[in-house]
């Protein structure tokens, strides 16, 4: 493994030490458990352990949001390219504690910003000194970093080249770092850490390079690994018999975990989404259901042992990974019971509610306008109607399923979804779940995979997509008490950024540059502002000095403007950028 370059810290314009001192509170497990009791702060990547991305702040509401204005902006770095990428982008969610904001750029530099006084002042920047060409060469889907976490007096972050870094919150000095992923194998890290008790949970990307996916827990006190659980079972382990070839395809079977998961403290359970099998499109190379790919996976947080799984698309031939966040909600059930659900909006175009205590299917429905790969879900199991457990290779709707004898096929939704990584949000008062939707179809071409074609740090996909069809988007609301679509606002472009929910508003952005606020009940547009850049990140909200703010990172990057831009030709005018926008009344 290549040796990591030491990270450096830059004091902003030499004045960090001259800023007025403010006492820092340590971020404890108790504070993280009770994050919603600190409404002015945003302490988790997904706002709370349940991943609802709901804030109770309501000074900005449906009646006055029309008066929302830019409060301040800040230019960040990380636009430069590397490897196969011409530029970096912004996909992160700012973390805010007691008026201080922590954000990352695509290369994993961490910025601390003082948000007091109605303006943003850079306190320090930590540059991890990632080797851009080496790491960027195996970043399948963009130069991306989705943010940081807080623990004690440390800012915990990842780098694209596979490091976990702890930075002193006060002075920006690196306290320690350790290598968690191995880019020599094609492993990179783009997701934000999840802090559970005294551990940082890390997910990995790299299924397009023939990795074997995993989740890993690092003890933040000792910097040692506590456990590592592979998402592709080893020989003799439960699920290993779902890889039925004689080529050891499981060893390069994918199952990456690149979106931050959720945590249920009542049962000490981590719930995490698992990505596509590899090679992506040649499912004849890997006969069997290919566990635990395309699954929601529940693990014992203390040991990493798998408690249950629910697989959405067995033997996936479409690159429909299930890597999305699982939102943990409690809703009224029959006869006075309470349903404890994990909600997942899949790239395959279906939304699922799973009993998070058992892993059993509760309900599912399509949330996109067009699904062609299957006729629907079996309402008992939630599996695609055409799924045949006696078959080692699934065809689903054979007319639109690409395979070695039908090398080119058009599928809906396309392999970006559905819903991709951009996070959903859930309003617990309205029981509405908001999904950032990609309304898509694309054309898939399959290439036969052989063991000889598998090489380290080279694409291992068994084909690839092209984009002859226009792709649009929507914000879709689902009533989780009924499992029915409650509303849909169609948008001219795919939703590549994600959702924020407040008591009576929903915030979202467009890759064409607009940030918008919608009525939480009706999805009627109440406010819109064009940032002048491409929105590829989710909005969040915080308060400081008694004033509420909305913040969003702006800078189009990721997979879209490299692999999918032909489906949205109007976005070719959007230039690379790296800006933080903050709004207030």
Task: Write out the residue ranges for each language-model feature.
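Extracytoplasmic beta-rich repeat domains
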Residues: 74-93, 125-149, 177-192, 209, ...
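Short, conserved, GDST-rich strand-edge loop motifs in beta-rich repeat architectures
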Residues: 202-214, 272-290, 439-468, 555-573
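N-terminal cofactor/phosphate-binding cores enriched in small/glycine residues
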Residues: 55-181, 501
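Blade/loop signatures of beta-propeller domains
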Residues: 25-71, 231-238, 394-402, 464-465, ...
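Repeat-blade elements of multi-bladed beta-propeller folds
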Residues: 42-46, 87-109, 137-163, 188-209, ...
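Blade-level signature of beta-propeller repeat domains, shared across WD40, Kelch, NHL, RCC1
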Residues: 540-585
């Amino acid at each position: 493994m290549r040796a990591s370059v030491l990270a450096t810290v830059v004091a902003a314009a030499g004045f960090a030490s001259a800023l007025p001192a403010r006492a820092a509170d340590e971020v404890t497990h108790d504070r993280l458990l009770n994050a919603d009791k600190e409404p002015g702060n945003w302490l988790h990547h997904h706002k709370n352990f349940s991943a609802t991305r709901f804030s109770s702040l309501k000074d900005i509401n449906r009646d006055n949001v029309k008066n929302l204005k830019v409060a301040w902006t800040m230019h960040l770095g990380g636009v430069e390219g590397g490897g196969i990428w011409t530029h970096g982008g912004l996909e992160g969610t700012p973390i805010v504690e007691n008026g201080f904001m922590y954000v990352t750029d695509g290369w994993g530099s961490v910025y601390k910003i003082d948000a007091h006084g109605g303006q943003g002042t850079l306190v320090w920047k930590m540059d991890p000194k990632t080797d851009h060409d080496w790491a960027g060469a195996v970043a399948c889907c963009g130069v991306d970093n989705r943010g940081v976490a807080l623990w004690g007096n440390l800012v915990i972050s990842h780098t694209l080249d596979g490091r976990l870094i702890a930075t002193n919150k006060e002075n920006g000095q690196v306290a320690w770092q350790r290598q968690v992923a191995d880019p020599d194998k094609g492993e990179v890290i783009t997701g934000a850490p999840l802090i559970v008790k005294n551990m940082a949970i890390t997910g990995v990307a790299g299924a397009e390079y023939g990795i074997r996916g995993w989740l890993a827990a690092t003890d933040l006190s000792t910097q040692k690994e506590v456990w590592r659980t592979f998402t592709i079972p080893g020989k003799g382990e439960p699920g290993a018999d779902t890889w039925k070839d004689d080529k050891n395809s499981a060893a390069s079977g994918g199952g990456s975990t690149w979106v931050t998961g959720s945590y249920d403290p009542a049962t000490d359970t981590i719930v995490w989404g698992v990505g596509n099998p590899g090679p992506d499109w040649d499912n004849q190379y890997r006969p069997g259901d290919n566990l635990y790919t395309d699954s929601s996976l529940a693990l014992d947080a203390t040991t990493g042992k798998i408690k249950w799984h629910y697989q959405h698309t067995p033997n996936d031939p479409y690159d429909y990974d299930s890597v999305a966040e699982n939102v943990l909600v409690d809703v009224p059930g029959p006869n006075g019971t309470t349903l404890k659900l994990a909600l997942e909006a899949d790239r395959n175009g279906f939304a699922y509610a799973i009993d998070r205590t058992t892993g059993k299917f509760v309900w599912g429905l399509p949330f996109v306008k067009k699904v062609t790969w299957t006729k629907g879900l079996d309402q008992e199991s939630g599996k695609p109607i055409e799924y045949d457990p006696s078959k080692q290779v699934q065809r689903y709707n054979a007319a639109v399923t690409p395979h070695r004898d039908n090398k080119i096929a058009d599928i809906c939704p396309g392999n970006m979804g559905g819903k991709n990584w951009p996070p959903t949000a859930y309003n617990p008062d309205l029981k509405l779940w908001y999904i950032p939707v990609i309304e898509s179809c694309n054309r898939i071409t399959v290439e036969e995979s052989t063991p000889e074609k598998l090489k380290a740090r080279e694409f291992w996909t068994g084909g690839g997509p092209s984009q002859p069809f226009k792709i649009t988007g929507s914000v879709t609301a689902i009533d989780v008490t009924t499992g029915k679509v409650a509303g849909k606002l169609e948008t001219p472009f795919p939703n590549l950024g994600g959702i924020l929910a407040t008591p009576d508003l929903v915030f979202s952005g467009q890759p064409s540059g607009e940030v918008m606020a919608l009525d939480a009940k009706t999805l009627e547009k109440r406010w819109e502002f064009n940032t002048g850049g491409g929105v590829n990140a989710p909005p969040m909200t915080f308060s400081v000095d008694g004033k509420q703010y909305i913040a969003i990172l702006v800078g189009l990057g990721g997979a879209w403007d490299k692999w999918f831009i032909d489906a949205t030709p109007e976005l070719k005018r959007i230039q690379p950028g790296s800006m933080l926008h903050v709004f207030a009344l």
